[in-house]
Amino acid sequence: MFVKILPPEVRRKIAAGEVIDAPVDVVKELIENSLDAKATRIEIEVVKGGKRLIRVKDNGIGIHPEDIEKVVLSGATSKIEKETDLLNVETYGFRGEALYSISSVSKFRLRSRFYQEKEGREIEVEGGTLKSVRRVGMEVGTEVEVYDLFFNLPARKKFLRKEDTERRKITELVKEYAITNPQVDFHLFSEGKETLNLKKKDLKGRIEEIFESIFEEESSEREGIKVRAFISRNQKRGKYYLFVNSRPVYNKNLKEYLKKTFGYKTIVVLFIDIPPFLVDFNVHPKKKEVKFLKERKIYELIRELSSRKHTILEIPTLNQKTESYKPTYEVIGQLNETFILVSDGNFLYFIDQHLLDERINYEKNGNEELACRISVKAGEKLTNEKIKELIKEWKKLENPHVCPHGRPIYYKLPLKEVYEKLGRSF
């Protein structure tokens, strides 16, 4: 058999298949383009799980009119110019293959207005063939519409999952990018209904909103590598999310290490900030997998974090007198006959007295209704002895974080923030 050179249209479809093999891949590439364009609001709309339509609209800086036709060409990128630039990639996109791949396997429309221009440009591409270019009136930003994904690749289209499955994958992906970009509003619409509405927040607030759980934060840094973990324990099942330089990534060994280190019933959201030249995102066409140059150092930092995972609050024996308590620890008292205030020297804890007592009683008798009925109530004045008794029992709880109904037992306020707000050093 003789070697043959494949026609351009065949090579184009093969290359596109390496980057795009499902609707979620399209959404990923378009969200990354929006984030690289400094968008602060991103709208994603899907119809039939993205098989019929994917639309992503942002308020980023837009695409310059001179570049509007270039963006659908293979290798068209503004992120890198030479091979050595791959060692210092700080953007999501850098290969210049995303829009080329998407437009090769769909009916594609892109409209964009550059922030220095008074009008926008629109291009239409079908199966890799440019159909039209025209001027359009629009706001600054970019909007991409992808119709009939894989219309020209029936074999690939046949292997797409059910609409609900594709929809769930897209929802999970949007949540991942929302986690690592809390400064951006994310809105997801499916079949005309808004299914996600995530307003900009601080990072911890965004994570707690998405997972509807209380998280503790730990961080460690060494030799220019910083590891930051948000941890929520005692879940029904564990979930483990890894972000490297703000990019959602997958690393099988690291995920297994997180499971073994933090436990199989813990949600762990791990951020690794590492110099670009110490990490390789160019392992796979989808940039989902990564390799580290100093992987052992990352494991050491994670192990250091895990050693603190049970030190949320170290409470001394409360039958001692106050004077003999550790100097960094203090039971302050009761607030509004509803909360018990406790400080460990670094944080001030507002503990809901009813929820705490309810958790204590539930772990003793296993009956939610009975535990609620016999527990102290909000609005009930507690003696110092009762407060000490509750705190002592709190230390022994199997799950000291949430009540039997899943509500958080306490809120933790960093004293450092209080000092900073009042212009004092901590």
From Swiss-Prot:
InterPro entries: DNA_mismatch_repair_CS, DNA_mismatch_repair_MutL, DNA_mismatch_S5_2-like, HATPase_C_sf, MutL/Mlh/PMS, MutL/Mlh/Pms-like, MutL_C, MutL_C_dimsub. NCBIfam families: mutl (TIGR00585). Coiled coil: none annotated. This is DNA mismatch repair protein MutL. GO terms for cellular component: mismatch repair complex. SUPFAM superfamilies: ATPase domain of HSP90 chaperone/DNA topoisomerase II/histidine kinase, DNA mismatch repair protein MutL, Ribosomal protein S5 domain 2-like. GO terms for molecular function: ATP binding; ATP hydrolysis activity; ATP-dependent DNA damage sensor activity; mismatched DNA binding. GO terms for biological process: mismatch repair. Pfam families: DNA_mis_repair (PF01119), HATPase_c_3 (PF13589), MutL_C (PF08676). Keywords: DNA damage, DNA repair. It comes from Aquifex pyrophilus. Belongs to the DNA mismatch repair MutL/HexB family. It comes from the Bacteria. Transmembrane segments: none annotated. This protein is involved in the repair of mismatches in DNA. It is required for dam-dependent methyl-directed DNA mismatch repair. May act as a 'molecular matchmaker', a protein that promotes the formation of a stable complex between two or more DNA-binding proteins in an ATP-dependent manner without itself being part of a final effector complex.
